[in-house]
Amino acid sequence: MEPATVLSIALAAVCIGVTGYSIYLSFGPPSKELADPFDDHED
């Protein structure tokens, strides 16, 4: 394979992995520990 193809596939895999992990943190079990700043400051 060409080095550019390998680099493109690796970069795409990293981007997909980071996106999947951020979705997991936002909506998965760890999201229970996230604080909502709008709920902290009631006016």
UniProtKB/Swiss-Prot annotation:
Gene Ontology CC terms: plasma membrane-derived thylakoid membrane
NCBIfam families in alphabetical order: PRK13183.1
Signal peptide range: none
Phylogenetic placement of the source organism: Bacteria, Bacillati, Cyanobacteriota, Cyanophyceae, Acaryochloridales
Its biological purpose: May play a role in photosystem I and II biogenesis.
TM regions (residue ranges): 7-29
Membrane-topology descriptor: Single-pass membrane protein
Gene: psbN
Transmembrane is among the record's keywords: yes
Xref: HAMAP family: PSII_PsbN
Subcellular location per the Swiss-Prot or TrEMBL entry: Cellular thylakoid membrane
Main localization (coarse): membrane
Identification of the protein by name: Protein PsbN
Keywords of this entry: Membrane, Thylakoid, Transmembrane, Transmembrane helix
GO terms under biological process: photosynthesis
Record-stated family: Belongs to the PsbN family.
